């Protein structure tokens, strides 16, 4: 049986080196991370170099694996521009165990501060950054016992991480990513992760996976607000009905009510603040792509603690969730879809924050607010079909 053909990485396969000029001075802070035990002083691969290589790979669709990354290190172009030397496969694989992702996270946050939300008069009344929160699953190449999970919807075994993401929708940037095992239970449950990471003065936009009175109470106590989609089976006690305006009706709002949710007999924790239930007419649908996911009966039910905003604006805030879905689509292409360079927790967070930085660099260099067309253009490029589209 013939052996596998060695895949060659050429100069033209490596892209994005010019875009990395802005971030390299920031990466230089990482040089000493993980060197505390290197008493002999013979370390050849440092964290700033490793992160530069990961960033380069995310700009280069041809680099699909750690072995491809190793071959790219042998190119004079890469060694000269990034200041790296040849690295062994073992060094690239094992070095992440001593690299702390926290300093890289700080760099991503600092870079994010340079991207400002563009004024949007429609949402000015919100008075808080609008933060869509959701999670996406990325599979590991190797099977890792502690990451083992069999989701009911798919019915197949997964070894994967869940990346819990906070996405500032008006500026188009992810501001936080936390990696946990994919199974949504215990400390890895999306509601538990968000409750640990709540910040003050934010407007959190949440899907049905974040239904939790305890979580909503915590968000309210932190001085933040939320707009969360409720279950189709939500039952509420109406205490006041708000009159709909013409703008509300034009936005397909059916009802706007102040409500009490929950019963002491069923719920350990009850809401401790005023809540509002807004119903919006939408197109009914079955489970997504034939999977046993939640259906929609034609009414979108939104729960919020913002009693001051028009109902139509609450509906528009929730519609902004499409941005994080498009971000995940692009983000997964940056991560190579199912290909993570490392199955170690540190390595996954480093790669996730590098992908986050690349998305920010795209925003900085294009100078445009993200929209569907921009995300689709980047997505086509990353899957290698942009060139064929241009030729056609």
Place the predicted regions along the sequence by residue.
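A short, well-structured juxtamembrane/interface segment
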Residues: 113-120
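Short, positively charged patches
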Residues: 150-151
């Amino acid at each position: 049986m013939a052996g596998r053909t060695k895949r060659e990485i050429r100069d033209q396969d490596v892209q994005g080196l010019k875009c990395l000029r802005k971030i390299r001075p920031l990466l230089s802070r990482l040089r000493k991370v993980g060197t505390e035990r290197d008493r002999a002083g013979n370390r050849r691969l440092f964290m700033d170099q490793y992160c530069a290589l990961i960033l380069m790979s995310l700009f280069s669709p041809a680099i699909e694996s750690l072995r491809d990354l190793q071959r790219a290190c042998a190119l004079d172009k890469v060694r000269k521009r990034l200041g790296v030397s040849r690295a062994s496969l073992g060094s690239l694989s094992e070095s992440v165990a001593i690299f702390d992702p926290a300093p890289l996270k700080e760099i991503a946050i600092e870079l994010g501060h340079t991207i400002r939300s563009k004024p949007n008069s429609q949402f000015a009344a919100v008075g808080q950054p609008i933060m869509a929160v959701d999670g996406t699953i990325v599979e590991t190449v190797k099977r890792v016992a502690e990451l083992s999970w069999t989701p009911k919807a798919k019915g197949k075994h997964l070894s994967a991480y869940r990346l819990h993401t906070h996405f500032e929708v008006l500026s188009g940037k992810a501001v936080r990513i936390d990696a946990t095992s994919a199974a949504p239970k215990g400390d890895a449950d999306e509601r538990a992760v968000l409750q640990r990471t709540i910040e003050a003065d934010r407007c959190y936009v949440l899907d049905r996976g974040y239904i939790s009175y305890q979580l909503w109470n915590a968000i309210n106590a932190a001085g933040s607000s939320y707009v969360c989609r409720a279950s189709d089976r939500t039952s509420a006690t109406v205490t006041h009905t708000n009159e709909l305006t013409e703008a509300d009706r034009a936005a397909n709002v059916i009802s706007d009510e102040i409500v009490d949710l929950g019963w002491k007999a069923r719920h350990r924790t009850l809401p401790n603040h005023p809540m509002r239930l807004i119903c919006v007419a939408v197109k009914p649908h079955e489970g997504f792509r034939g999977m046993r996911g939640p259906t929609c009966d034609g009414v979108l039910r939104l729960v919020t603690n913002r009693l001051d905003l028009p109902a139509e604006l609450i509906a528009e805030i929730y519609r902004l969730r499409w941005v994080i879905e498009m971000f995940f689509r692009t983000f997964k292409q940056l991560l190579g879809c199912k290909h993570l360079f490392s199955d170690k927790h540190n390595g996954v967070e480093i790669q996730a924050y590098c992908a986050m930085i690349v998305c920010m660099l795209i925003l900085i260099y294009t100078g445009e607010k993200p929209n569907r067309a921009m995300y689709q253009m980047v997505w086509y490029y990353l899957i290698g079909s942009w060139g064929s589209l241009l030729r056609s």
